Curated annotation (Swiss-Prot):
Motif (Nuclear localization signal): 184-200
Disulfide bond in keyword set: no
Listed name of the protein: Large ribosomal subunit protein mL64
InterPro entries for the chain: Ribosomal_mL64, Ribosomal_mL64_sf
Cellular component per GO, a single term: nucleus
Function: Acts as a negative regulator of G1 to S cell cycle phase progression by inhibiting cyclin-dependent kinases. Inhibitory effects are additive with GADD45 proteins but also occur in the absence of GADD45 proteins. Acts as a repressor of the orphan nuclear receptor NR4A1 by inhibiting AB domain-mediated transcriptional activity. May be involved in the hormone-mediated regulation of NR4A1 transcriptional activity. May play a role in mitochondrial protein synthesis.
Cell compartments where the protein resides: Mitochondrion; Nucleus
Amino acid sequence: MAAPVRQTRSLLGWVTTLGPGSRGYRAPPPPRRSREPWWPDPDDPLTPRWQLGPRYAAKQFARHGAASGVDPGSLWPSREQLLELEAEEREWYPSLAVMQESLRVQQLAEEQKRQAREQLIEECMAKMPQMIENWRRQQQARREKAQADKERRARLQAEAQERLGYHVDPRSARFQELLQDLEKQHRKRLKEEKQRKKKEARAAAMAAAAAQDPADSETPDS
């Protein structure tokens, strides 16, 4: 307990030894503004450019009034500046009517978008049963085609084994070559059959057209 008391007394004694004349740092007072208007030298290269423009003149007029010698009419913006300010104000600070109209247009666009989406959903849902039926038909046709290809492949393999003998390995190169030849012959027969049916259908259509309009082939009586 005695040690802190002695430290406090020593600090107080050190402060008293500084004397009443000693004091700490004191900041200098701010520079006073001139009571008279001050105009910079335009010929001085160190003069800031903004002090030679209308901003500085407006500042002097705002501080000193008529004593600055500034014509108040020269402080008004020009027609071009007014138009620019009006355009900027319309862009960044639109009126209440403009804001309401913009909000109305935005809400109308959102409503139209929502209605279009709902209509699209309704149309898709109406087409869904037919789409499901078409998908099932495609799946059925795909399965039938795969089954037909499998059966055709089995028939060709059986025909190849009959020609080469059942002792031949189906994985051999000779068997595979014969199988490819049989497949080519089968595709050729299918193509010829398709062309024959097309010719027969064309001939039948021409015959039907000729039977429906026999008067075209006859010469009218003079």
